[in-house]
């Protein structure tokens, strides 16, 4: 259960991960670690003008953090650790501080970074987690607003307004505070992704289908409904390369059950309308000559997102290459359960409205 905004909790490491370094935990015992969730909800319910099955995304008009709308928190001039999960249906958050304070990014949804990464802002998709430290002793003011400027839907939707551009306020107490905590220069070094380990290369295409009036009615992965027979059957313990081809207008956070992966690069798709037309006809990236279209500009993965993750943002009109491990990343040990047992697993978009509209495919494993 997430701590309330005024509850003090001890610094703990994410479940399943060993301590961050032999030098000790990221923050010394006694420091504050406050798990947070950010979501957006309507203050007043509205009678839907469109059937929920065809509601592409839901955006509320109140930003809620740990059950409170636009809360505030009183902090001392010292380091605090926050674990933030984006629990919104569909809203992306691009977090930044109004007074210019930075974030020291130490981990994500699956693992620690190899080294702490200093960032002034960061983008968090639905279901993504950021593990970070904020040092309020660096503040040049007595308050700081955790702000958001991500359009909705992301990335080409409406700009934020006065209400949803603010997440919460930090009131920074005056006076010097003794802070003996240290942030290690090295956290955890996991095995580096090795393309030569990949036994299979897959192409996964994301589609959006619209009505005659241009309204989105359903979203498919690989042009198939969830009920269609399984087509992805990885071997337990294997490594694969997945090329995610996003043919929609939205950024889709992709989550793979039992898989941990590293985002390698994102390549722009040129002449995407022509490529999409071919893909919707035959749904075969090779036959549609994907290499002919995936030759635009490349987007480098941000330094704080180069580690192992279980969800990642798939940019629209780009092909994102990821290396997926279907095993533990810190060892070659197999799962302590039968991953081949029924009913199997899934991979899906983690925008809740897309997921509930079965932008999802079955995933079965074999030995």
Where do the model's predicted regions map?
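Terminal connector regions
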Residues: 140-171, 341-342, 346-358
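Short, charged beta-turn/beta-strand-edge "cap" motif at the junction between a beta-strand
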Residues: 87-89, 136-139, 151-152, 246-249, ...
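Histidine-centered copper-binding motifs that mark active-site loops
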Residues: 1-125, 129-135, 154, 163-212, ...
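Active/binding-pocket-proximal capping segment
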Residues: 98-112, 247-302, 328, 353, ...
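A generic structural signal for residues embedded in beta-strands
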Residues: 82, 132, 146, 242-244, ...
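C-terminal substrate/ligand-recognition segments
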Residues: 195, 201-263, 308-330, 334-348
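Ordered core of a single globular domain
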Residues: 92-95, 128, 132-133, 140-152, ...
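Short edge-strand/loop segments of extracellular domains
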Residues: 99-103, 149-154, 174, 242, ...
């Amino acid at each position: 259960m997430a701590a309330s905004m005024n509850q003090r909790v001890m610094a703990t490491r994410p479940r399943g991960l060993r301590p961050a370094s032999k030098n000790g935990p990221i923050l010394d015992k006694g420091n504050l670690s406050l798990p947070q969730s950010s979501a957006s909800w309507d203050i007043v319910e509205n009678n839907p003008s469109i059937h929920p099955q065809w509601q592409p995304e839901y955006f509320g008009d109140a930003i809620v953090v740990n059950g409170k709308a636009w809360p505030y928190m009183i902090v001392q001039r010292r380091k605090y650790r926050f674990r933030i999960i984006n629990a919104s249906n569909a809203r992306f958050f691009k977090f930044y501080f109004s007074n210019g304070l930075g974030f020291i990014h130490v981990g994500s949804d699956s693992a620690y970074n190899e080294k702490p990464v200093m960032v002034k802002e960061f983008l968090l998709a639905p279901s993504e987690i950021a593990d970070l430290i904020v040092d309020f002793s660096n503040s040049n003011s007595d308050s700081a607003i955790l702000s958001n400027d991500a359009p909705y839907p992301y990335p080409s939707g409406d700009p934020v307004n006065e209400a949803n551009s603010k997440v919460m306020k930090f009131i920074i107490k005056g006076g010097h505070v003794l802070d003996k905590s240290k942030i290690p220069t090295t956290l955890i070094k996991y095995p580096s992704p090795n393309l030569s380990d990949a036994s299979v290369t897959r192409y996964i295409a994301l589609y959006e289908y619209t009505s005659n009036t241009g309204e989105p009615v359903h979203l498919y992965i690989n042009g198939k409904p969830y009920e269609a027979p399984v087509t992805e059957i990885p071997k337990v313990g294997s490594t694969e390369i997945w090329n995610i081809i996003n043919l929609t207008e939205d950024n889709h956070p992709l989550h793979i059950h039992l898989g941990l992966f590293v985002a390698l690069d994102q390549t722009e798709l040129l002449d995407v309308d022509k490529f999409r037309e071919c893909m919707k006809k035959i749904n075969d990236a090779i036959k549609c000559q994907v290499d002919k279209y995936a030759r635009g500009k490349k987007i480098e993965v941000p330094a704080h997102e180069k580690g192992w993750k279980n969800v990642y943002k798939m940019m629209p009109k780009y092909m994102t290459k990821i290396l997926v491990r279907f095993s533990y990343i810190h060892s070659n040990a197999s799962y302590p359960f039968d991953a081949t047992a029924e009913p199997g697993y899934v991979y899906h978009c983690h925008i809740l409205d897309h997921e509930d509209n079965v932008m999802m495919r079955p995933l079965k494993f074999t030995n």
